[in-house]
C-alpha cells in the first residue's frame, strides 16, 4: 500500500503596482518542480495595489491568485496579503513583482526556517550578488548605513534591512501583522524593527539583485524621510505582553 506524500505549503506574496512589464517573468521563474521534489508546494498570491495596467490580468492568466488592495501603498498591499494567507500554509514568502529578485532562490530562504534555525529569513542584497545597474552607489550606502544602525540599535543580526525579499514561518507573520501600521515604503523598516522588538529569530541569506523592469515608484526624498522616522520611532516601541506570551507558546510547540 502506497503512502501519500505530505507537502509543506509556501504562500508567496507579490505586492504589485503597475508591474505588467515584469510580473510574467517573475511568475514563470518559480521552481515548482524542484520545490515539489524537496517536499514543498508553492502557491502564489499577487496583491494588485490598484494598478492602472494589466498586472492583475497577466498574473491571473499565469495561474496566480489575485488579491485586490484599493488603497495605494506598498504597506497596505503587504498587510492585505498577510491577512489573506490561509491557515493551511506553513511558510510565507514575499518578493517584489519587478523582477529584481530571483524566485529561483526561494528554497534557500526557506531552508533555515524549515530546519528550525530561525523564524524569519531576510534576503540580503548587500552580501549577495548585485547585477550592474541594480542599485546606485548612493542607495547602496544608504542601505548599508540603515542596516548597520538597526544592528547596533536594535540588536538584531540583519545585513539588508530594506530588502524586499523575506521568508517567514507563518506563525511569525501572525504575530507581526497586528503591529504593522505603515502604508508605504517604510514597511520593510517597520517589519524588521518590530520583529526585532518581538524577539523573532532573524537570519540573513545572500540573494541576487537585478535591475528592475519598469519605472520605480519610490520617491527618494519623501520615502527616505518616512523610513528614517520609522527607524527612530520604533526605538521606543514595545510589544504588548500578550504578544510575547503568544510567541512563547508557538516556540514551545
Q: Predicted regions span which residues?
A:
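Hydrophobic helical membrane-anchoring modules
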Residues: 1-8, 155, 179-253
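Donor nucleotide-sugar binding loop of glycosyltransferases
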Residues: 19-22, 51, 74, 99-102
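Short, well-formed alpha-helical segments that are part of the catalytic scaffolds
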Residues: 19-35
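Hydrophobic targeting segments
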Residues: 8-14, 23, 30, 43-47
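Short beta-strand-to-loop acidic/aromatic patch adjacent to the donor-nucleotide binding site
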Residues: 89-100
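Short, structured coil segments at secondary-structure junctions
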Residues: 61-63, 198
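A conserved acidic beta->alpha catalytic loop
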Residues: 48-56
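Acceptor/aglycone-binding surface of glycosyltransferases and processive sugar-polymer synthases
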Residues: 70-72, 76-84, 91, 103-185, ...
Amino acid at each position: 500500500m502506497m503512502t501519500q506524500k505530505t507537502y509543506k505549503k509556501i504562500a508567496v506574496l507579490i505586492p504589485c503596482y503597475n508591474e505588467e512589464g515584469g510580473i510574467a517573468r517573475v511568475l514563470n521563474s518559480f521552481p515548482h518542480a524542484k520545490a515539489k521534489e524537496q517536499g514543498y508546494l508553492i502557491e502564489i498570491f499577487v496583491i494588485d495595489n490598484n494598478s492602472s495596467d494589466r498586472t492583475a490580468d497577466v498574473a491571473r492568466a499565469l495561474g496566480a491568485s489575485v488579491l485586490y488592495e484599493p488603497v495605494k501603498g506598498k504597506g497596505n498591499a503587504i498587510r492585505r496579503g498577510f491577512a489573506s494567507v490561509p491557515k493551511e500554509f506553513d511558510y510565507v514568502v514575499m518578493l517584489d513583482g519587478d523582477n529584481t529578485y530571483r524566485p529561483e532562490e526561494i528554497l534557500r530562504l526557506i531552508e533555515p526556517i524549515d530546519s528550525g534555525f530561525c523564524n524569519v529569513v531576510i534576503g540580503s542584497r548587500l552580501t549577495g550578488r548585485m547585477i550592474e545597474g541594480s542599485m546606485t552607489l548612493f542607495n547602496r550606502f544608504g542601505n548599508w548605513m540603515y542596516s548597520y544602525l538597526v544592528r547596533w540599535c536594535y540588536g538584531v543580526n540583519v545585513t539588508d534591512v530594506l530588502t524586499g525579499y523575506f521568508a517567514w514561518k507563518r506563525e511569525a507573520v501572525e504575530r507581526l501583522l497586528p503591529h504593522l501600521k505603515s502604508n508605504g515604503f517604510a514597511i520593510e523598516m517597520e517589519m524588521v524593527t518590530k520583529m526585532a522588538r518581538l524577539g523573532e529569530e532573524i537570519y540573513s541569506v545572500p540573494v541576487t539583485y537585478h535591475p528592475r523592469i519598469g519605472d520605480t515608484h519610490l520617491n527618494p526624498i519623501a520615502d527616505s524621510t518616512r523610513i528614517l522616522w520609522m527607524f527612530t520611532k520604533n526605538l521606543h516601541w514595545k510589544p504588548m505582553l500578550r504578544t510575547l506570551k503568544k510567541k512563547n507558546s508557538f516556540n514551545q510547540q
